[in-house]
């Protein structure tokens, strides 16, 4: 199913916020 999660910041992986956690919720789909 799909669930919302918050991106963790890694160099070169936007979106990022202040080098910590991001405030952009993103929906991802995972199998099972």
UniProtKB/Swiss-Prot annotation:
What UniProt keywords are attached to this protein's entry? Amidation, Disulfide bond, Ion channel impairing toxin, Knottin, Secreted, Toxin
Please report the PTM annotation for this entry: Amidated as well as non-amidated forms are found in the venom.
Q: Is Disulfide bond tagged as a keyword?
A: yes
**Expressing tissues:** Expressed by the venom gland.
Family stated for the protein in its record: Belongs to the neurotoxin 10 (Hwtx-1) family. 30 (Jztx-14) subfamily.
Function comment: Probable ion channel inhibitor.
Name of this protein: Jingzhaotoxin F4-32.60
- Which species expresses this protein natively? Chilobrachys guangxiensis
């Amino acid at each position: 199913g799909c669930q919302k999660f918050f991106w963790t910041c890694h160099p070169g992986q936007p979106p990022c916020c202040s080098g910590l956690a991001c405030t952009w919720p993103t929906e991802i789909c995972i199998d099972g």
